[in-house]
Amino acid sequence: MMEPADTVARAFLSVERSATEQRWVSRLDQAGQNRALAMSQIHAIPELIARVLAGRGVGVDDALAFLDPTIRSLMPDPHMLTDCEKAAERLVRAIETGEKVAIFGDYDVDGAASSALMYRFLAHFGLTPEIYIPDRIFEGYGPNPAAMQQLAANGATLIVTVDCGSTSHESLQAAKDAGTDVVVIDHHQVGTELPPAVALVNPNREDDLSGQGHLCAAGVVFLVLVATLRLLKDRRNRQAFTLDLLSLLDIVALATVCDVVPLKGLNRAYVVKGLIAARHMNNAGLAALFKKAGLGGPVTPYHFGFLIGPRINAGGRIGDAALGSRLLTIDDSSQAEVIAERLDELNRERQAMEAVMLAEAEAEALFEYGDGSGAGVIVTARENWHPGIVGLLASRLKDRFRRPAFAIAFDPSGKGTGSGRSINGFDMGRMVRAAVEAGLLVKGGGHAMAAGLTVERANLGKLRTFFEEAAAKTVNELVESSVLKIDGAIGASGATLQLVDQLEQAGPYGSGHSQPIFAVPAHRLRDVRLVGTAHVKITLEAMDGSRLDGIAFRAAEAPLGQMLLNARGRNIHVAGTVGADLWQGQRRVQLRVLDAAFAP
């Protein structure tokens, strides 16, 4: 479901240039407003919520079903996935004959969740699979021949690769040569020539017509497990009738949120139902991590994406890559708490390292590019940076300078491992592939919004020039024409917990289903102050005296933060997202400030 394109020329609240140099526009054109009004009148949906739905492409007839998605109505027949039947049959054979199975996963949240899903399923039928997660630094992404040979030597007669393997020709051939079957379950792009596998289930195969290419790996694994369970039931396997697959949706939801796949169709149902499963705290590992993260209130996508995901990822970034999958497979609460404690420690270490690296990266970027205006691509590089954190740096730099950004970590030999993040409208992956073809990179690839690369230090200057020439014109045009789409206007008195609850029902929000942005027009900035060293806390006051608290995260040094800090007592327009904050056990409304402009 695509979000409607901006077709409205008139600036919302007449904001032509905001603090973040954006033009504010209404998300809805006249046809969209008419659709929202009809939706509200026909289905008795609050008008503001109807505007949110209409602004995200939901039709009038689909509104009620959208607000209550079900797995049953949105899940396709798993056999529509190419090779799903073959994969299910091979898994059933392994279960029926008690084979030694190994699971090879990726080192991110989706990889950990996919590995845990497969492990829990097979363990229910009495198998004890071995999980192998490669080291990010020493082994890199995906199966490698040495690891596959080792798993075969350990006795594995079947290796299931999850969230990887679609292009691992040499590694899968090594497993085949060792007499071990391989089943690949993945969602990454696939080449025209497939690696040697018993089954390769990937909705992004050219010959796959399932239409499920937007699923993360855990979402694909779940469909394979549905098919496998059906086959086991057909064969009257007694244990098959005691397994509730829906109870595993908490892990699927975690992966779906953290892998930032579009929250549409089956993905949205996965998250809605997975959040319900997560609130029961039946997964000892998730429960321990929620406790360690200080979760307050019901589990939300925010908790998955910003509290749980970073902690699981910390293991893969700077510590033991297998910690995340181990945590999600464990049933012993005391053991889960030990692993959760270690992941929390690693996350704090990662945060400290990131803070130092970010300060260095921003200083370099400011020296090289000033405020970034006019630059096509921000490229920063250091020798002492941790390669597991450069992706986070690139994301921060992209947000700070509003331009595509790369962070590159060089090792003592002069080889640099880099990661990049792009802005909407600029295809970073294509630019990186062009640099590979130009001989400037050892290797590189990616997609429109993110890319990875390996470069020799001797080519860094040439690479900067190549990127600048490739991107400057397009990027500066994109920045100059940047707009912020506003879903509607609310006053301080209208920002209520009831509104927050209604907005949550229209969620979850994420990629492909963006969080609603509301404008709070012409309110007096009653109070503004720094929170810590980076965040800006504000209190807005309406003419009737009602107030609304807000916070602009990591904005202190940015133009938005500087504007707010110097606008006390003035009337301003503020744009942001509305949510609930838990303070001393009490829920209260809080505006997450994204932009602002002075009111006439």
Label the model's feature ranges.
Residues P4, R17, E89, R93-T97, ...:
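Mid-to-C-terminal polyanion-binding domains and interfaces
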Residues L53, V160, N313, L503, ...:
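A residue-level signal for conserved active-site and pocket-lining positions in enzyme catalytic cores
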